[in-house]
Amino acid sequence: YFSIMLIFIILVFFLITQNSNATLEDNFMWPLDGYTYISSYFGYRNSPTSGASTYHSGIDIPAPEGTNILAVCSGTVTFASWGAGGGYTIVVENDDIKVSYCHVSPNFIVSKYDTVVAGQIIANVGPKNVYGIINNPYKDSLGKPTNGATTRLPFTFNNKKRWFSGKSAKLFQYALKQK
């Protein structure tokens, strides 16, 4: 039973240089140990809340309040505060990517300018009254997500905790939609 919906929004702002030979897939971690269900994918969707955008710039992962959130990648914390539309938000950036963790607990584990490594605990899933998703229509009367998202991750996510194999927003969107 999930007591809360973590809305994990990944804003993909790639700054990868054209001559880079490094692969990204070995540098990324899944953000929630034991929680792999994606209830809402990157891209266009039916908005789960009235007035919200139909374009979703990240993925939603349901997890219980207090669940540890792990850094997807190594980098520097560039934002740790209240963010419009994202509730309490932490942003981690490196030379390749910028990742936003939205709707986290207001009791931040990291601060702006901290350096983090992939897999490090940076936050916890926040209480729903912090960011106003009370009466959120993500679940039906049986507690199941209502947006038709798959209950298993695409093959690019199945290598234990390894995550993300694309190098562009289009590949990222495609990978998330594969079943």
Language-model segment annotations:
Residues 48, 102, 109, 167-169:
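Short acidic, gly/pro-rich beta-turn/loop elements at beta-sheet edges
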Residues 124:
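Short glycine-/small-residue motifs
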